Amino acid sequence: MRSSLRFASIVGAFALSTVAITPAMAAAPVSQAGANAVYLAVAGNGQGTGTVTATNDGSGEKKNNVGTAPTVVGALGNNPVLKAGVAAQDATAGVADGAGNSAACAGLAGEDGSVVKIGSGNCLKPGKALTLSLANLDLSNTTLIQPGTALDPLTSQLPALPVGQTLGTVTAAIEDAIAGTPLGEIGLSGNFGALQARCTASPGTAQGTANLANTSGDDQHTPITLSLPGGTSVILAKIPVNPAPNTKVVTGLDTVTQDIVNALKTQFNDALDGVAAPLDTVVDAIQDQLVTNLVAQLQPALQPLEQQVLDITLNKQTHPTPDSIKVNALDLQLLPAAQAAVGSSLVNLQIGNVACGPSGRVASSAAVAAPEAPAALPTSVSAGYAAMPGQHAGQGDDSSNAIVLGAFALLMAGAAGFISFRRLHR
Amino acid sequence: MNESVWDARIATWMSSLLVLCGVLAVAGLVLPSPAVEAAPTPGYQAMAAPAKPVRLVVPALKIRAPILPIEVTPQAVLDPPRNPRDVGWWQRSARPGATKGQTVLTGHTVHTGGGVMDRLGKLRKGQLVRVVTPKGTMTYSTTRVVTWSKAELARRAVSIFAQTRPTNRLVLITCSGWTGKDYTSNVVVFAKPLGVREKTAAA
């Protein structure tokens, strides 16, 4: 008898433990979100503000990397692309009525911009103009030019030439030249008050938006300017403050293609003239071939320019699953054609990057355990007032009546006195 | 613990169960069954279908007040309508005319006067309470008037508010026990349904 009870107790305890542990072991996030203010990669070498992530499996929100990157300067150091500004990135993951929900917001504002609490609205208030500029981008450390790609024709011929030993010098010179080419001097600028993306997700759905507040005084559009060597500048596009999902900034790019090609030739020749002078006439041929080949390599890449040189997408949205979303307020890729050479765009800049979802529901056992039952049945009836609404306690009907009667008595006494006074003075 | 002790205990339990069965059997013979209690009262007929209450009439207390649906708060508090002259019907409770459950109405008591249920505690057994609905006026007969402390009411919450009763009854609740600062108790009136007055009887 006793041994049977012990056995039953052990089995019961095991069963209870299993029931208690199983949900914890099976607990998967029912809501999740992530936010990153800025990501900048030059030739595939990325740096950014880190990513704030939030997850919730029904037992509470868990967040990572909270408080990273208060400013752009702090996050990106001496980057040449973005100057001082305020970065915001926050994500939240919650559960309401057993359903997971998440939200995220991230972006940049100019100096004096401020970060506001994440919610359904924006997370940044605009400050001074936030200038996006690639004008001084230093390409000297990139590997855009590699012997195996643009210089292939040259490397295959140089060993047969007497100047083979100068290969290293020339290659270095070309790299230096590239560093000073129009590619390095292309300027892209736009003055933003704030540039941010946000998203929300709940079971079965996920939405995202991007907002590009401007400082130009025009409430509807923000101009994006491309500047070329010599001070030429072209307004590429006037982008809407609230761009539609996956808006491409392409307007006018094809008009500057030839300008860039011409500038490239000039820059290459000027740069090589000095370095290659000691090599006399042999170098001229190499130089011509080099420039021709280099431009030939680049030129197809510049046609069409918007696809190969500068690719900007605003409010870039992707849905990894139907109930999740990723939003980039601005996704900029400079020279995507460099993909073949360096494995990535020369420059990839992403501002305001958020992801929300997918979302699920807390296991039904937890939902059943929600404290709904106690509220279903009243346990108290609060049906008493001290006095009628608008009337103070202690000034009930009795006291009110007394005041009225007193006032009436005073009025009557006054009237009687007045009548008596009149009679006495007749 | 040896087996003789167990045998003694089991015998005690069995005896108790037998006594309990006997008590229940006697009670079943003596007390009226729910079916008997729910039988139509002469002069009254069952309501065609349950309907939402719209007006409370208590002739003995000169109460004539509109009824508005109310809901329990997340804190499990049942608050009457804000206007102390209105009566609240807990909309999760039974509709007048239902054969089961409890129809719960509550109204304010105002210490300085003017509350719709200021004098609810004065109601006496047998006095009538009428609840007007779009489908007829249900008449109830007062069966019990009690005053319970707030804590006692909370303890009795299931018996007062639960909708599992096999027969319907009306429950009227207001506050009492004014201390000069707040109310410490509730007056609760229970009434059994008589039905809708037959037209011939009404005429």
Please provide the spans of the model-predicted regions.
Chain B
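N-terminal membrane-targeting segments
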Residues: 1-43
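Solvent-exposed, non-transmembrane regions of membrane-associated and secreted proteins
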Residues: 27-203
